[in-house]
Amino acid sequence: HWLELEKSLGKKGRMMSIQEADKQSANPNFAKGKEFTINCQTCSPAYVLREWGFNVTAKGNTKGSLSEWISHGRSFEVWENLDGTKVAPVFQKDWLSSHGYKQMTEKRWAEYFEETCKEEGTYILTIGWKGGGGHATILKRTKEGLFYIEPQCYDEAVGAKRPISELCKDGGSVVRGSRGILRVDDKKFLEKFLSIFEKGS
């Protein structure tokens, strides 16, 4: 599927490390305007494509843009399985129900992350915060364990691999239907959404 992306994005380079794909490089304009502070739904796939070796960055989330459309609970709609079938995220509401839980707690968030992200790979998470509002971000399972990667805004003090405990503490107890986790390193990014990225030189 990379060959199709190369037609639009140019030839991909070598696969990037976590640090190269992250470190504010997926969203370099974060400090330049509000639209780059509310574009998490674009930063997350930008990070994934960067891991694959494509030099892309996230465009801002402006009114009427494709990024705005994705931000309304559609983060998983930009992906499909390699055989062209629809993806199946592990939605938080379904996970709670299958465990007989009514709502999330700090401990249950950790359980959900660990259970859903068992295999080594890159995952997109959509989550609601305790104080309201939502976020799309990256979970990464490596040989060392499970990490939280924040492609929208890099924190030099914390580094690229952040502890998932940050998300467990801040995750809201009530979950919304469209929020969940999807493994994406083994998926196809749909070409019709490529305009949400800026192409690097």
Regions inferred by a protein language model and the residue ranges of each:
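Short small/polar-residue motifs
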Residues: 110, 133-137, 176-177
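Catalytic nucleophile-His microenvironment captured as a short glycine-rich beta-strand/loop
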Residues: 122-151
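Glycine-rich catalytic cores of cysteine/serine-nucleophile enzymes that process amide/ester linkages
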Residues: 152-158
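Noncatalytic regulatory segments and standalone regulatory/sensor domains
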Residues: 158-201
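Glycine-rich short-loop/terminal segments
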Residues: 1-119, 126, 130, 181-185, ...
